[in-house]
Amino acid sequence: MNIDDKLEGLFLKCGGIDEMQSSRTMVVMGGVSGQSTVSGELQDSVLQDRSMPHQEILAADEVLQESEMRQQDMISHDELMVHEETVKNDEEQMETHERLPQGLQYALNVPISVKQEITFTDVSEQLMRDKKQIREPVDLQKKKKRKQRSPAKILTINEDGSLGLKTPKSHVCEHCNAAFRTNYHLQRHVFIHTGEKPFQCSQCDMRFIQKYLLQRHEKIHTGEKPFRCDECGMRFIQKYHMERHKRTHSGEKPYQCEYCLQYFSRTDRVLKHKRMCHENHDKKLNRCAIKGGLLTSEEDSGFSTSPKDNSLPKKKRQKTEKKSSGMDKESALDKSDLKKDKNDYLPLYSSSTKVKDGYMVAEYAVEMPHSSVGGSHLEDASGEIHPPKLVLKKINSKRSLKQPLEQNQTISPLTTYEESKVSKYAFELVDKQALLDSEGNADIDQVDNLQEGPSKPVHSSTNYDDAMQFLKKKRYLQAASNNSREYALNVGTIASQPSVTQAAVASVIDESTTASILESQALNVEIKSNHDKNVIPDEVLQTLLDHYSHKANGQHEISFSVADTEVTSSISINSSEVPEVTPSENVGSSSQASSSDKANMLQEYSKFLQQALDRTSQNDAYLNSPSLNFVTDNQTLPNQPAFSSTDKQVYATMPINSFRSGMNSPLRTTPDKSHFGLIVGDSQHSFPFSGDETNHASATSTQDFLDQVTSQKKAEAQPVHQAYQMSSFEQPFRAPYHGSRAGIATQFSTANGQVNLRGPGTSAEFSEFPLVNVNDSRAGMTSSPDATTGQTFG
């Protein structure tokens, strides 16, 4: 072995990287060139100056050879391969130096020789350093190889207990590219993708991927629990369950939360604690960090912000970081877009104009009578916005609209706001002049004229549905006007057309009003027309016909109260407003003022009403109905309204002789069935006094009273109209009813235990109507039942 080669190996192992490369280039270039006198002289001068004997150099060579042999024994095959690669790289570098010009070689060699003189101080010290430095690189390389070594070369314990090296994961899954060491592990993994479960339980047909899972499951059927707790004696199928149970006795809590450092005895409880307590907290922290600009990019920081991410594996951590970065970017973009939208579309009104949930800002239209006022808020120099008055509509209330506090002068006084009227749902009836004024103004809705007005309300209803039904019927009248006739509801005289009066009373009177509303000077209806006064709109007739057809068989109960053995009833029917008109008068007036087709329609309507009355009067089902009960006890019962709906009921007293046995009544018993009825509304509900048995004991006591009543009725009724006796009332009643739609003139009233039978009378003020004298009383017509013989009506 040449000295140059020995020196090369020595410098390679003892010197630094720069020194090794420089010394090697110097020696090789000096030996190969042979022509440069400078390098040879320098080497001779170095050897002479140091005066090193030849024997010492040989001894050093032997030491180097021994060290190289030891190094070869200690260095593994991989390290030797690395060493050979470094030598090859050095040779390539030497070839590049050989290709350099000669002048540059001298420049490179001169300073390098000086460094060699400095490094070589003593041979013994150098040998000691050589031994230490030979050991250190081997240990460092072993440590580095342990970290960088693949798991395929780690010693493991095989299934049979023998030691062996891990083979590389050559078995790759086709579905997810996962690598496995053996084909068994690969096949077990493929079962997850295919869903195949080859191991089946013989008792419950459950299937499993692995055999040990099947064996563990079979212990459930056999009841075998091989693992037992030493303290409490509980048994478990799995050993893991037993160990987890033992921690409840010992109080051991090996699992710690990495956020709050709290300890837990089970892993599932740790996961639940993290999920409930720390996940939302981490999200909030990340949002705050994004807002404050504390988070930087992954390339600059090089670490994750949350400790939870550090505990994850590297691949999962990278996936979560990518997802979180993508979500952060998307959230930042969404927030920026929202901010831009908010800036682009600023609200017209400030936040103070917002109202509670119960209110909403309704659509409004503001009339600007003056141009200066209309453009003042648009041309304001200060830039402030003054919105107009808004109409607030309460959603929960039923169509109670609040009007603006300040009204323009051009709006009619009909739309003025009165809170008390709106709260009571008062739907007022205005006069004709107010309606004419409102029709002239096209900006005002016609419904407002019906809802509010300056005149006093005739009646106000607390039932909103009834009021709205009245409003719908009023709209039929307005729709039929067609700019040719005006309809007005007035408080005044009685209408000249009785049939029209009856229909209008049925459509106007509210359902919640009692029967006492039909008194003198109550609501009267006058329908005025420019061309024809005897025509009822088709819509009103249609609604009345529909109402009769749907409610023909309806029936309402009437409550009566009795006190001190006197029959006390709350029925008070004063039908002075419903006149009686003979068929000749009705037909004559209709033929003079209306055409033949409309008269036929009215006659058909009257026939329909007559049929409805016949159905109610001849219905035998009313005989056993407990709708009328007269109780003659000494108890004082509270007076209740007799009829819940006066305008939509028909009060008809069925045969007067039909009181049941055991009754002591002052009324007359007649062999024939006399019908007595009063039509007030557009319905035909009857309230009969019915019974097939007669009381012969009470006939003698009431005969005098009935004779007196009949005689007085004949004396008063003959000067004006034809009188109908109670015994012969049925047949003459039908003939005048076919031609007229008026109510029956005769009135039946029971009040405070007294029975009043009033015949048709005359009046100076209303000579054409027989039922005006309402308040007159006749002492001879009143009678009260005997206290000793009073019984309960059937």
Curated annotation (Swiss-Prot):
GO molecular function, one term: RNA polymerase II cis-regulatory region sequence-specific DNA binding
Location of N6-acetyllysine modifications: K607
Biased composition (Polar residues): 574-588
Positions of region (Disordered): 298-336, 574-599
Keyword terms: Acetylation, DNA-binding, Isopeptide bond, Metal-binding, Nucleus, Phosphoprotein, Repeat, Repressor, Transcription, Transcription regulation, Ubl conjugation, Zinc, Zinc-finger
The organism's place on the tree of life at top rank: Eukaryota
PTM characteristics: Sumoylated with SUMO2. Desumoylated by SENP3, resulting in the stimulation of transcription of its target genes.
Glycyl lysine isopeptide (Lys-Gly) (interchain with G-Cter in SUMO1) crosslink location in chain: K356
Modified residues (Phosphothreonine): T194
Biased composition range(s): Basic and acidic residues: 321-336
Residue numbers of Phosphoserine PTMs: S51, S250, S301, S306, S412, S665, S784
Chain residue numbers at which the record places covalent cross-link Glycyl lysine isopeptide (Lys-Gly) (interchain with G-Cter in SUMO2): K6, K88, K115, K132, K291, K308, K356, K402, K421, K424
GO CC terms of this entry: nucleus
Subcellular location(s) per record: Nucleus
InterPro entries noted in UniProt: Znf_C2H2_sf, Znf_C2H2_type
Segments forming C2H2-type zinc fingers: 171-193, 199-221, 227-249, 255-278
Similarity annotation: Belongs to the krueppel C2H2-type zinc-finger protein family.
Job description of the protein: Involved in transcriptional regulation. Represses the transcription of a number of genes including gastrin, stromelysin and enolase. Binds to the G-rich box in the enhancer region of these genes.
Quaternary structure (record): Interacts with HNRNPDL. Interacts with the 5FMC complex; the interaction requires association with CHTOP. Interacts with CAVIN1.
Name under which the protein is recorded: Zinc finger protein 148
Originating organism: Pongo abelii
